[in-house]
Amino acid sequence: LTSSYGMKLKGDFKALETSIELYRKALRMLIPIINDGWNLISERRYVNQKYNLIEKWIHNTHTNQALFDFDEQFPKFPTYLRRSAIAKALGIVSSYRSNLENWEREGKGQAPKLSLTHFTYPAYYKGNLFRNFDPVNQTIELKVFKNGDWIYEVYQLKTSDCNYYQTHLI
């Protein structure tokens, strides 16, 4: 069971907005890569195999030379955000491909279009993109892109949000 709860923040919103925009730009880059490689991706049976294939296409390691310049476009992009963007882009393309297949079979209406722009947000999971939640001081540290690097930045929280978190989400 997964639960989510939105909290009001006070702090450097510019850094947070920049981080979200970078995530969305990564998504815009990944969608056509995944769509163009759909035949190879769809041959993979398990979703983790699909994620691994896409990650090999975009991420350099000691044993892998990426086919696309994702790492150059998004230097120091956190692993969790990269994998989150891959999962989101795979879902977008999968939905588009399913809709396209249905349209081709039924031939009704206009053909679906694959949009590259999505106003989505990354999930900030504990340990990956947030840490040090302090209900007493009403603060939390979020990973944001600031001054050319991904750092943890302290944000203030509302008392009611801290109380709700302690009561319902711990």
Where are the language model's segments positioned?
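Nucleic-acid substrate recognition interfaces
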Residues: L1-I170
